[in-house]
Amino acid sequence: FYLMLPFYKLFPHVETLEVLQIWVVFSAVIPLKLLLSKLNLSKLANILTILWFVLLPVLTTAGGYHLHENCFLVPLIFWVFYFIVNEKKWGILISTILLLLVKEDAFIYVFSIGIFFLTQKRFNLTNKTKKWLVITEFLLPLLYFTLAMYLLSAFGEGGMVSRFDAFLLKDENGVLTVFKNLILHPSFAISHLFMAKKLGYLFLMLAPMCFLPLLQ
């Protein structure tokens, strides 16, 4: 949000923040365009991909509610992808750190990116890059999350565990308990993931992407 401060100083209005939030989200077009240039797709495919991106409802409604730090996730995730595909060591590190700094639970996104690139066969990454990914996409986010939770507990009101209430049993609390239930009680966790309401939500999220994530 400090990146928005100079603009808000010049134009101290609520509308300024809303416009800036939209610009931040759609700045992801830059790393997306750079990433597409590495995929050797046809010109038409590149145009359609960018068009799909800018028309995706979940992005076009980014400024429809209120100012939220999640607006920084979209461009930063694309930058992490771009630097990994190009095997830019320091680019991977810097973009990953910036992504983690958005929020304490951003480590989930970083973990997911790391798992994808270490298991996929689309990009031929060198062993050196894969080792670097283990450090930046697994060890670093784990250390960051541990430190962030400590600081939030010691100097704040703790992490926002309430969003994980579905994975907590009666009278339970804490992030560690969530992880414990995911490991020791997987059927309990799965039963809460695949409820009718949530399956409907997944359908609405995947339909605009033609269910392509399920093919990976």
Regions found by a protein language model. Name each.
Residues 23-55, 74-75, 90-94:
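Transmembrane-helix signature of polytopic, membrane-embedded enzymes
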